[in-house]
A protein has these predicted regions:
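C-terminal active-site subregion of NodB/CE4 polysaccharide deacetylases
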Residues: 1-4, 42, 59-160
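Active-site beta->alpha N-cap acidic-glycine motif
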Residues: 1-43
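A short alpha-helix capping/helix-coil boundary motif
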Residues: 14-18, 52-53, 76-80
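A cross-domain feature marking catalytic cores of carbohydrate-active enzymes
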Residues: 18-22, 49-51, 88-91, 129-131
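Append "and occasionally in soluble cytosolic enzymes with long acidic Gly/Pro-rich linkers
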Residues: 37-41, 48, 74
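Substrate-binding clefts and substrate-entry loops adjacent to catalytic sites
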Residues: 48-63
Length: 160
């Protein structure tokens, strides 16, 4: 994210969100660091939680879930100096009980890996996204999304 996507987003004035696994930051060469997170935030990016260890949440006990959610949020808030409002489910695995624990941990919303849009009726703890996957059509998909952004905005489908 920091080496590839961030410079392009910064160059063109786009904003984005990076979901961080707090125990991974700065642990290996090439991994994002907290300094990198702070720099990205200064340039309009949002840093959000992806738990402590990126474990599939449906495999964890309630105590383990709470630890993953709360400790990740606390660590990110301490490093960034502000509230961390959002999280993304590792591997996309969640259920309504897990979503409730996310809410109880203090997050304002959570993101799935399900492909789709968001409306006022969407469950804010199970928000769908429109990903850009690395495929032979990645560049074309990205260019089309940029090209059609004005139309999406006119329908109220985007917010920045």
């Amino acid at each position: 994210n920091y080496d590839n996507a961030y410079p392009i987003l910064k160059k063109y004035g786009f904003k984005g969100t990076v979901f961080v696994v707090t125990s991974f930051l700065g642990t290996r060469k090439g991994y994002l660091t907290w300094d990198g997170c702070r720099e990205m935030e200064k340039n309009g990016m949002t840093v959000a939680s992806h738990t402590v260890d990126h474990k599939s949440m449906t495999d964890l006990t309630d105590d383990q879930l709470r630890a993953e959610l709360v400790e990740s949020k606390k660590k990110a808030e301490a490093e960034l100096g502000h509230e961390v409002k959002y999280m993304a489910y590792p591997t996309g695995a969640y259920n309504l009980h897990i979503a409730q624990l996310v809410r109880e941990a203090g997050y304002k919303a959570a993101f799935t890996i399900k492909y789709g849009g968001v409306s006022r009726k969407s469950n804010i703890y199970a928000l769908e996204r429109v990903p850009i996957f690395h495929t032979e059509k990645t560049n074309r998909d990205f260019v089309e999304r940029i090209h059609y952004t004005p139309q999406f905005e006119s329908f109220g489908w985007t917010k920045h």
